[in-house]
């Protein structure tokens, strides 16, 4: 999985691991572990079940059925009961307990307005709760205070100085034990409803197999595409990058670069 970006430059850590053999803990059974053919067939069955599960999620229609604290208490403006998820906005975000404690993503929020920063970080934490992602509490980062001294004007008042003070606030949220597809959905939802004036840094942890380098070398120009977080985005830079990735010029130079690197690797 390539590095994914959310608003700003992003780094992606990768933990390489092998798939262990499924050992049988029972000492009475003569078969101590799975054979290679059995293990391969088991993996195929798991992949088929995973694809069927994803297809079921895409095809099934979920009916919106909000829960209410009380159906008798009505909102004086809308004349309707207040949904539970709207009532929870008055309280701090609810967290799901981590199951394994494997960190999959971290989002940092930085901005000059403290209220916008709290709103953005709590929005990410609430979205993680409704997506079933175990998430940490919203944590504060170190506040940065900077003082800038500049001249008032380059001519008549060149010797007069003027001071400007800028305070940068920060928050961060950790996500645990979620699949890459759910993390992509979470980040795309946050990117879609991003608040202006808040800087989002997403650090994503992914796990790849030992043959990841071979798969990376086998990529072609047709496999290069924008992350799912930019689908439906109005960002002109993202739209221009997507246009360049689909252009024939990019495919031409990408194939030429792969051909130029192949003789060096053979040596």
Curated annotation (Swiss-Prot):
Q: Which InterPro entries match?
A: Ribosomal_uS10, Ribosomal_uS10_dom, Ribosomal_uS10_dom_sf
Q: Briefly, what is this protein's role?
A: Involved in mitochondrial genome encoded proteins translation. Involved in the binding of tRNA to the ribosomes.
This protein's assembly is summarised as:
Part of the mitochondrial small ribosomal subunit.
Organelle transit peptide residues = 1-10
* Gene name tied to this protein: RSM10
Q: Which UniProt keywords apply?
A: Mitochondrion, Ribonucleoprotein, Ribosomal protein, Transit peptide
Its predominant location is mitochondrion
Family matches, as PANTHER family: 30S RIBOSOMAL PROTEIN S10 FAMILY MEMBER
Q: Where are the transmembrane segments?
A: none
Question: What is the protein's name according to its record?
Answer: Small ribosomal subunit protein uS10m
Q: Name one GO biological process term.
A: translation
Q: Which domain of life is it from?
A: Eukaryota
Q: Give me the Gene Ontology terms describing cellular component.
A: mitochondrion; ribonucleoprotein complex; ribosome
Give the record's family classification. Answer: Belongs to the universal ribosomal protein uS10 family.
Gene Ontology terms for molecular function: structural constituent of ribosome
**Which SMART domains does this one have?**
Ribosomal_S10
Localization: Mitochondrion
